[in-house]
Amino acid sequence: MSKYAAAPSPYSHQPQTPEHKSKTLVVGLTGGIGSGKSAASDWFAQQGIDIIDADVIAHEVVVKGSSTLRKIQRKFGDWVLNANGDMDRAAVRTHVFTYPDALIELEAITHPAIREAAKKQLAESTSPYVVLSAPLLIEAAEAGLANLCQRILVMDATENTQLARASQRDALSVQKIEAIMVNQLSREERNRHADDVVLNESDLAALYVQLEPLHQDYLKLAQQLKFAAD
């Protein structure tokens, strides 16, 4: 897979419209549960790279009193709120798991808000390039986050490694982890949409050895993009 040519993908993460034509290189970071996304994200942050975390944004856009939470309440009813006026995440999670169409309706509300918040953070970034971390960057094509990225970096790990890490880190049952994995792309499918793949099967030191040359490549690409935009 070419270091500098994007891999063909039906999810098309190449810039499509003027709003994506930024002088800042955006690297989309994704991977299955337990693949090491957080470890990679932390390492890039230690190198001075700004991190846009879609999971964090997803929580921020539905805080108590937010316009997004009010839209969810109007769509589904008052039961989406707990006694404190916060979103009852457990109730909402159970509802969308039981009624798949409800998940589509929920994401139609949350995805635009997440995308706009990500774009705002991108516009405010001052680092040489930006890492946009999103577990479902490829799967959730309708969210449009992948279209903000010029590169897709996939953290890869075997299913056994994913299960071991996730069960140790999150104290989840094997059944729960497997249920999460079912809703994510397979390793093979995810890797087909990647520009860069890091096989994370060992310790942090081994991971960092793989990330360093990618970081240097991204710095060079960021410079090329900046000069091309000037």
UniProtKB/Swiss-Prot annotation:
Reactions performed catalytically: 3'-dephospho-CoA + ATP = ADP + CoA + H(+)
A single GO molecular function, which one?
ATP binding
Q: Where is it chiefly localized? A: cytoplasm
Pathway entry: Cofactor biosynthesis; coenzyme A biosynthesis; CoA from (R)-pantothenate: step 5/5
Top-level lineage group: Bacteria
| Gene3D superfamilies xref list | P-loop containing nucleotide triphosphate hydrolases (3.40.50.300)
Which major enzyme category is it? transferase
Q: Outline the segment boundaries, as ranges, of region: Disordered.
A: 1-21
Assigned EC number: 2.7.1.24
Any single GO CC term annotated in Swiss-Prot or TrEMBL for this entry = cytoplasm
Tell me where in this chain the DPCK domain is found: 26-225
The UniProt annotation places ATP binding at 34-39
Q: Does the keyword Transferase apply?
A: yes
Which CDD domains does the UniProt entry name for this protein?
DPCK
Spell out the Pfam families in the cross-references. CoaE
Could you confirm whether the keyword Kinase appears in this record?
yes
Q: What does this protein do?
A: Catalyzes the phosphorylation of the 3'-hydroxyl group of dephosphocoenzyme A to form coenzyme A.
Question: Record's family?
Answer: Belongs to the CoaE family.
- Identify this protein by name: Dephospho-CoA kinase
